Amino acid sequence: PDENSFDAEQESKFLKEKSESENEIEIIAVVDNVVAGTAGIEAVGTKYKVKHRAELGISVAKEFWGLGIGWALMNACIECARNAGYVQLELNVVAENTRAIAMYERAGFVEYGRNPKGFQSRKTGFQELIYMKMEL
């Protein structure tokens, strides 16, 4: 939400492009007509040397934590990544987000690096990012 600058038309275009893509996806979880979470996979790049990799992103609104929404979104994205032919799925997560890290580890993601100032929040300043990956 802190960085969301799309208006309704831009968001519609973004979602249309994702829905027409053969190797990227954006999923929206809705509970009682409220957006509870979003998730997606995006190609790391189109060049041969990186086209086997995709990046996963998940966001669940705090009031919907603990309901399995993140788990469902993540597993749907993993399945889509496999179906799209990706070999490696990557993500980064703020080190303080222990709930998400536990979920990713339970799914089979492993840590492969850290960046002490990888994320900057307007509220809390710099935070450490953990880089994780999963072989598909």
Question: Where are each of the predicted segments found?
Answer:
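Acetyl-CoA-dependent GNAT
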Residues: 3-63, 74, 80, 135-136
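Residue-level preference for beta-strand/loop junctions
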Residues: 21, 52, 85, 126-128
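Conserved beta-strand core positions
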Residues: 54-56, 89, 130
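Short amphipathic helical patch at the helix-1/turn junction of helix-turn-helix
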Residues: 60, 94-95
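Conserved active-site alpha-helix within GNAT-family acetyltransferase domains
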Residues: 67, 71, 83, 96-113
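Conserved GNAT acetyl-CoA-binding A-motif
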Residues: 74, 81-92
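Conserved catalytic-core motifs of GNAT/GCN5-like acyltransferases
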Residues: 90-93, 105-125
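Terminal substrate-recognition subdomain of acyl/acetyltransferases
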Residues: 126-136
